[in-house]
Amino acid sequence: MPEMLQLGPVTVCAPDDGAVLRYSEQAVQDVLDFFSLLCFGSNEWAGEPFQLLDWELDAIRSFYGVQEQDEDGSWSRYRRFLYDELPKKNGKTEVAAGLGLYHLLWDGEKRPKVGIFSSDKDNAAQVYDAAKYMVEHTCLGQPEHDPIAWAVDSKREIHTKYGGVLKVYSADVANKHGYSFSAIIFDELHAQPNRKLWDVLTAGSDAARRQQAVIVLTTAGDD
């Protein structure tokens, strides 16, 4: 059995390379503070303040709270992948949209590039639509003459005044080589016909990013 470390409320396997880990309450609180600015972006709760469910809080603590010490003594996010399989109607689209906006606006990247992927472009567009609603119905889209972020429906993109972009991409593999995303939101991974798109998006794509995030929130499939 691998050695386990208890870091605050999170249990992790001890790193094989001897990396020094810690649990950062502040890193978790930064994510929670951002979500406190958001509203729900779809269904009958649209416009209501965003209330995180227990599973969402657990995922945030586990992914964002664990940090490793870098060679220069600074701390960065230890985990690159957040993966959760969920039953239907469990808030997956909403939290995916919220996390996409977090990585677009709040994660410390100077020019973030957030990609939203799914089994088809229309499915990924549900995440975009929720994120767009959140931007346009909260302080993120204010003031109207100089907003922090705004949507470009013709391209299914959300831009920021600081040069960041969140965008819906097709599931075509051939034109995805060479992308460097600061964050990847992958919806309904179980519905992919094979692992080609996954491999193209994740193999080496973090080389130019200090703490790339790959977030997979999927409905449990048959395979």
Provide a role label for each language-model segment.
Residues M1-D223:
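Phosphate/NTP-binding elements of NTP-utilizing enzymes
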